[in-house]
Regions:
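Catalytic core of bacterial c-di-GMP phosphodiesterases, primarily the EAL and HD-GYP domains
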Residues: 1-61, 72, 136
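EAL-family c-di-GMP phosphodiesterase catalytic domain
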Residues: 18-20, 43-53, 72-73, 77-166
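Conserved ATPase "switch" residues in P-loop NTPase domains
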Residues: 68
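Leucine-rich repeat
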Residues: 29-34, 63-65, 89-91, 121
Length: 166
C-alpha cells in the first residue's frame, strides 16, 4: 500500500505462478490489495502446474474468472511458453485484458516468420479488444518495425531496465 501511495501514477504488475492460485493465502492477499486494483494488474506466468483433481478439470479457468470478478486486470505472460498458449487464451478471452508475447521465443526464427506470427496475435487481440504487449524489444530497429505494424505496447531493455521503487 505504501508503495502504491508513493507512486500513485505508476501501475504495478504482480506476477503469479499458477500454483499460487491454489493457496488460500494468495486470495487473502488479493482481497487485501483489492482497493488498489486500479494500479495493480496480475500477470499469470507461463509455468505449468498440476492442479488438485478436487478443484476440477477447469480449475485454472475458474481461478482466472475469480480474479476478474475481484476487479483485477489480468495479463497472460509469455504466450507460447509453458501452459500459456492459444487454447488458454481462447478459453478465457472474456476474462483477460492483456496478452504478452516475448520475442525471445523467436530467437531461432527468421524475421518474416516472427512478424507473421506477431501479426496474427495482433489481429486476434484487436478482434477481442485485448491489449498486446511485445516483450524482449532490444533495439530501435525492431521497436520501429513493431510500431509500424501497430504494435505500440513494448517492453524490453531498449526501453529501459527495471527500476527499484522501494
Amino acid at each position: 500500500k505504501k508503495l502504491v501511495d508513493r507512486h500513485s501514477n505508476t501501475n504495478l504488475a504482480l506476477n503469479l505462478h499458477p500454483k499460487q492460485l491454489q493457496h488460500p493465502s494468495t486470495w487473502t492477499f488479493l482481497d487485501n490489495i483489492s482497493s488498489m486494483r486500479g494500479n495493480v494488474s496480475i500477470e499469470l506466468t507461463e509455468h505449468c502446474c498440476e492442479f488438485d483433481p478436487a478443484d476440477g478439470a477447469d480449475a485454472l479457468q475458474t481461478y482466472i474468472s475469480n480474479m476478474k470478478s475481484k476487479g483485477f486486470s489480468l495479463a497472460i505472460d509469455d504466450i507460447g511458453s509453458g501452459q500459456n498458449n492459444f487454447e488458454l487464451i481462447s478459453k478465457n478471452v472474456q476474462n483477460i485484458h492483456t496478452i504478452k508475447i516475448s520475442l525471445l521465443d523467436f530467437r531461432n526464427t527468421n524475421e518474416d516468420s516472427m512478424f507473421f506470427s506477431l501479426n496474427n496475435w495482433l489481429n486476434f487481440s484487436n478482434r477481442y479488444n485485448l491489449k498486446m504487449v511485445v516483450e524482449g524489444v532490444e533495439s530501435e530497429c525492431i521497436s520501429n518495425k513493431l510500431k509500424n505494424l501497430g504494435m505500440v505496447y513494448q517492453q524490453g531493455y531498449y526501453h529501459g531496465k527495471g527500476q527499484v521503487l522501494c
